[in-house]
Amino acid sequence: MPAFAPVPVSAPAAGPVGVGTPEHRPDARSDSTRSVLLIAAVALLGVVALTVAVVMFSKPRPVDTSETAAGVGAAVPDGAPETPVSTCGPLQAAIGPLTMRQKLAQLLMVGVTDIADARSVVRDHNVGGIFIASWSDLSMLQDGSLRELQVAPAALPLAVSVDEEGGRVQRLKSLLGAQPSARELAQQSSAEQVYQIAKDRGTKMRSFGLTIDFAPDVDITDAPDNTVIGDRSFGNDATTVVEYAGAYARGLRDAGLLPVLKHFPGHGRATGDSHVGSVTTPPLSELKTSDLIPYRELSTAKPVGVMVGHMQVPDLTDGLPASMSAAVYRLLRDGGYGGPPFTGPVFTDDLSSMGAITQYYSVPEAVLVSLKAGADVALWVSTAEVPAVLDRLELAVASQELTIDRVDEALKSVAVMKNPQLAC
């Protein structure tokens, strides 16, 4: 309901003064006497009008018992702005009871070996997400034990992620069957066929309890198939990548999974392999003309996540990997990449086994730096470091090295990712 401002009360319009001239009226007075009386009369009328206006605009409305919860029983004066209605109650109910350590644990996603490992890290440390890796025992996806863990009482449900791109990156091949690489799909199939492939595989993944697929890869490259990105890319031009990666993301989304675009801000033309060591992309000005276009086009179809890679970007990251750079997260969040400000969940790439990170950071420090920079979820591939990571993060919060506002910002993003109805 819009706020209404009081309408100014106009003084009564003056009618014809004295029908006829003074000599035609009985008991005519002098001009000066008439002027004094006229001024007094007008003043009196003004006082009366002002009094009426004050009474009218200060009188409260009768209480409308049909109003909804936000305004039940509240008498709102005409002309006063209405108090904004908060719609964040469900979100606060979900995250409010969490301790600081539990809040921090929600920002972690860790690889697990089997269901016992998963149970331990979830029940003992309250981590918000687990990652199904190539070495994970997949029986937990088939025997219902993962599903049991997901329905256990918790403030927020457990997120379960996987890297399932097709081609070289298939963690669930034994359960889903083989899928051609992204490059092969774009060369041999229509976009609609790719959509259906992703939807069919996504539906099976969802039935196993998976909630997130770190796919599609939206990097742009014409590099040989066996290079770091190579055939993981749908093509060497933005148009092809947008069409086919968009279809793949839509299929996953329609199957009930969260698709995650990667590797922001673009690994396709970077020099080197971030699994081994530092890599560098072209300057940001060049990335905007090609590598960032898929993010610009595909980030508007929701829900969708983004994974930030470990590349260094000249004139942007100041020698830091992108996943550790506040400038990169601002680029995404503020729309500096050329698209709308991104409001979905943002993940790091693996922080524990990729040379671009491990040469410079321990896992606890890498997690801390990435969360400080702007990541919502820090990803790595084993559970052993979880206690040390949480200890380090708690110390960082206590010393204000990691602000409570940053923790809450990331936590709200994670909560909405897990339950979109909590958005406010």
Question: What are these language model-derived features?
Answer:
Residues 1-37:
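Terminal targeting segments of Actinobacterial cell-envelope proteins
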Residues 28-34, 49-83:
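C-terminal region of N-terminal signal peptides and the immediate post-cleavage residues
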Residues 73-116, 349:
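Boundary/entry segment of secreted carbohydrate-active catalytic domains
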Residues 99, 141-148, 243-401:
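Second-shell residues forming the walls of enzyme active-site clefts
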Residues 104-112, 128-132, 158-165, 212-216, ...:
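Hydrophobic faces of well-ordered beta-strands that scaffold small-molecule active sites
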Residues 112-124, 194-204, 288-295, 362-369:
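Short, acidic/polar
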Residues 151-177, 197-221, 241-265:
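Glycine-rich, aromatic-flanked loop segments that form ligand/cofactor-binding clefts
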Residues 395, 399-424:
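Mid-to-C-terminal alpha-helical segments outside catalytic/metal-binding sites
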